């Protein structure tokens, strides 16, 4: 993901087409950016934050006024619009708020000067995310041993962030250092991020990865093939509860049963200190067609059947062995 000045837009890889096709999109309007985030053309909490930062800068460039009050008013309208694209991932709103603070912190500057600072802030958000992800990987690698079997859910690799990933960062670093991890990737229904994205990027990197259906996690754990679970996070509440892709809490319950450490990896930007617990996190519900029709040549459920399709679930803090950020490893007793 990057800003292209010549195209005056944000360049993203359309993840909805992977692994069959690699297609890059140029996003130049608020509507295109909103659509890309909502339809998961760009996804992963950190990546959404970076996309929002670049996106609101692109939109701000197009606000054609020298009047600062008019500029701020239009900027805030765009900010609120983009913030509604995905309600669960805290990085989205955090990045947009950070971009707005550029204006608030420099009230005496002109509109062109504001625009220049917005560009620099968007770049800083991306660079900080990349550095954080690598450090997350280094911190987690301290807990892993060469040859371990590692299970992951959804996609928290370089497709979900600026570089390396969060949950996949230690796997990539381990691959560079000859650790020989054996990774089990849950397919992650209903949108198959594990099958389409995690298996895709790990196999391209030469990692030993085995794809399994979500309901097979218990089997590979029982066989002793899994020694650790690593997942990303979209929001961490103040008490340590975690919102992540639907199915994560089930994996955590299985890991607890089989006495396998369950690690949540994410940058500190995903921690929402204003959110007391998981029950306070708004869970996005998505189109029923994602369950009944997507990926199938024909509908696979009765036409009139009701569908419940939450995009995320809450993993209680008591099921989490440690939360690993760029700042360090945090266990239950030192939250």
Swiss-Prot record:
User: Which pathway is it part of?
Assistant: Amino-acid biosynthesis; L-methionine biosynthesis via salvage pathway; L-methionine from S-methyl-5-thio-alpha-D-ribose 1-phosphate: step 1/6
Q: Where is this site: Transition state stabilizer?
A: 154
Gene Ontology BP term (one): L-methionine salvage from methylthioadenosine
EC numbers for this chain: 5.3.1.23
The record ties this protein, via SUPFAM superfamilies, to: NagB/RpiA/CoA transferase-like
Highest taxon of the source? Bacteria
Q: Which reaction does it catalyse?
A: 5-(methylsulfanyl)-alpha-D-ribose 1-phosphate = 5-(methylsulfanyl)-D-ribulose 1-phosphate
> Where substrate is bound, by residue?
43-45, 86, 193, 244-245
GO MF, one example: S-methyl-5-thioribose-1-phosphate isomerase activity
Active site annotation, chain numbering: 234
> Which top EC class is given?
isomerase
Keyword Amino-acid biosynthesis set for record: yes
One Pfam family it belongs to: IF-2B
Question: What keywords were assigned to this record?
Answer: Amino-acid biosynthesis, Isomerase, Methionine biosynthesis
Matching entries from InterPro entries are given as:
IF-2B-related (IPR000649), IF-M1Pi (IPR005251), IF_2B-like_C (IPR042529), Initiation_fac_2B_a/b/d (IPR011559), M1Pi_N (IPR027363), NagB/RpiA_transferase-like (IPR037171)
What is the protein name given in its UniProt record? Answer: Methylthioribose-1-phosphate isomerase
């Amino acid at each position: 993901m990057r800003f292209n000045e010549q195209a005056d837009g944000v360049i993203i890889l359309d993840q909805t087409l992977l692994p069959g096709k690699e297609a890059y999109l140029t996003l130049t309007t608020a509507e295109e950016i909103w659509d890309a985030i909502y339809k998961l053309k760009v996804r992963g909490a950190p990546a959404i934050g970076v996309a929002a930062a670049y996106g609101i800068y692109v939109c701000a460039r197009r606000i054609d006024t020298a009047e600062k009050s008019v500029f701020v008013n239009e900027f805030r309208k765009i900010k609120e619009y983009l913030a509604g694209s995905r309600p669960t991932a805290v990085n989205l709103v955090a990045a947009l708020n950070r971009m707005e603070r550029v204006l608030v912190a420099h009230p005496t500057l002109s509109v062109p000067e504001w625009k220049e600072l917005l560009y620099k802030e968007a770049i800083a958000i991306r660079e900080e995310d990349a550095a954080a992800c690598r450090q997350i990987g280094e911190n987690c690698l301290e807990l892993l041993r060469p040859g371990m079997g590692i299970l992951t859910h959804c996609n928290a690799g370089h497709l979900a962030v600026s570089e390396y990933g969060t949950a996949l960062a230690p796997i990539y670093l381990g691959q560079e250092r000859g650790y020989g991890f054996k990774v089990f990737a849950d397919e992650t229904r209903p949108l198959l991020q594990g099958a389409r994205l995690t298996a895709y990027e790990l196999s391209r990197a030469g990692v030993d990865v085995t794809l399994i259906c979500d309901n097979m996690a218990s089997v590979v754990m029982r066989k002793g093939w899994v020694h650790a679970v690593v997942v990303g996070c979209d929001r961490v509440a103040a008490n340590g509860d975690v919102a992540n892709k639907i199915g994560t809490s089930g994996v955590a319950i299985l890991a607890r049963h089989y006495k396998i450490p369950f690690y949540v990896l994410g940058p500190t930007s995903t921690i929402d200190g204003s959110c007391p617990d998981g029950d306070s996190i708004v869970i996005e519900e998505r189109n029923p067609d994602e369950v009944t029709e997507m990926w199938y040549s024909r509908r696979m459920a009765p036409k009139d059947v009701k569908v419940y399709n939450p995009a995320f679930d809450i993993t209680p803090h008591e099921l989490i062995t440690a939360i690993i950020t760029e700042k360090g490893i945090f266990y239950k007793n030192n939250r």
